[in-house]
Amino acid sequence: MDLSGVKKKSLLGVKENNKKSSTRAPSPTKRKDRSDEKSKDRSKDKGATKESSEKDRGRDKTRKRRSASSGSSSTRSRSSSTSSSGSSTSTGSSSGSSSSSASSRSGSSSTSRSSSSSSSSGSPSPSRRRHDNRRRSRSKSKPPKRDEKERKRRSPSPKPTKVHIGRLTRNVTKDHIMEIFSTYGKIKMIDMPVERMHPHLSKGYAYVEFENPDEAEKALKHMDGGQIDGQEITATAVLAPWPRPPPRRFSPPRRMLPPPPMWRRSPPRMRRRSRSPRRRSPVRRRSRSPGRRRHRSRSSSNSSR
């Protein structure tokens, strides 16, 4: 009996030791299974990272195409920076030891972004350059137009060829003026108005027109303040009249509308006034009604008497 009990105890102890050893050190087959599972997980992670990197590359390609179509350099630099950052993140997820290199790459990508943004801000796009060039060309083309207008306005007026002679005595005639002023140049015309009542007497002034403006200037210098028939005369230049614009064609007068009929001529105020006596009429009737009653009462009293 004692031997059987001892055998049972020894068997129980051996079983417990086997359990402890199994819990402490797993079997080599289990280790292989676990290593296979870990390798599968790693391969899955690598496949996922590869897919993400391929997606990022596809996105970068599409962005590059868009940037090439638009012709903007800033979008290209951003796509390159995003591709570098995607590659750095894939390397960081695959191995923990390359985390420092990923951080350095991300830092370099951020610096490249800042440099690309600064370059894009420094160098404007070709479309903006075209707009700026158009604005500059327009602004440059405006000043010559103003200069031309100012030159046209400042154009010198033609020199006068006609001279007005005033304060002449009534004894002076056209022949006298012809003799005096013909010494300065060829005279084109002499106009000497005469009084209506006395046609043999002049009005005291005359107009002498020369062929050249230089001759008219000579006559002005020598004869302004000179004497004819013992009296000082005045000589002034007559400016050429500005060309008047042609008279405007007046439109024919508009036909007057016929007057409205009599029943339409009355203004609305008269209508309002015409309504007011109608409103007052019942008041007058009320005021007359007591008088009528009095007359009736008097007539009734007379009849009773």
Curated annotation (Swiss-Prot):
Q: Where is this region: Necessary for interactions with UPF2 and UPF3B and UPF2-dependent NMD?
A: 69-121
Effect in UniProt of substituting residue 53 to A: Abolishes phosphorylation by CSNK2A1 and partially reduces splicing stimulation. Does not abolish interaction with CSNK2A1 and subcellular localization
Record note on what altering residue 207 to A does: Abolishes exon-skipping
Q: What does this protein do?
A: Part of pre- and post-splicing multiprotein mRNP complexes. Auxiliary component of the splicing-dependent multiprotein exon junction complex (EJC) deposited at splice junction on mRNAs. The EJC is a dynamic structure consisting of core proteins and several peripheral nuclear and cytoplasmic associated factors that join the complex only transiently either during EJC assembly or during subsequent mRNA metabolism.
Organism of this sequence = Homo sapiens (Human)
Where, per the database record, does this protein carry Phosphoserine?
53, 155, 157
Positions bearing Phosphothreonine: 161
Sequence ranges of Low complexity compositional bias: 68-126
Q: How is it modified after translation?
A: Phosphorylated on one or more of the four Ser/Thr residues (Ser-43, Thr-49, Ser-52 or Ser-53). Ser-53 phosphorylation site is important for splicing and translation stimulation activity in vitro.
PANTHER family in the cross-refs: RIBONUCLEIC ACID BINDING PROTEIN S1, RNA-BINDING PROTEIN WITH SERINE-RICH DOMAIN 1
Molecular function (GO) terms for this protein are: mRNA 3'-UTR binding; RNA binding
Q: Where is the composition biased (Pro residues)?
A: 242-262
List every position bearing N6-acetyllysine.
218
| Protein's name in the database | RNA-binding protein with serine-rich domain 1
Q: Where is the composition biased (Basic and acidic residues)?
A: 33-59
Q: Where in the cell is it found?
A: Nucleus; Nucleus speckle; Cytoplasm
* Superkingdom of source: Eukaryota
Region: Necessary for interaction with SRP54, nuclear localization and exon-skipping, residue numbers: 1-161
Report the residue ranges that make up the RRM domain in this protein. Answer: 161-240
Q: Where is this region: Necessary for interaction with TRA2B, nuclear localization and exon-skipping?
A: 238-305
InterPro entries for the chain:
Nucleotide-bd_a/b_plait_sf, RBD_domain_sf, RNPS1_RRM, RRM_dom
Q: Where is this region: Disordered?
A: 1-170, 240-305
- Segments carrying the region annotation (Necessary for interaction with the cleaved p110 isoform of CDC2L1) are 1-220
Tell me where it mainly resides. nucleus
Q: Does the keyword Repeat apply?
A: no
Protein's GO biological process:
DNA-templated transcription; mRNA splicing, via spliceosome; negative regulation of mRNA splicing, via spliceosome; nuclear-transcribed mRNA catabolic process, nonsense-mediated decay; positive regulation of apoptotic process; regulation of alternative mRNA splicing, via spliceosome; RNA splicing
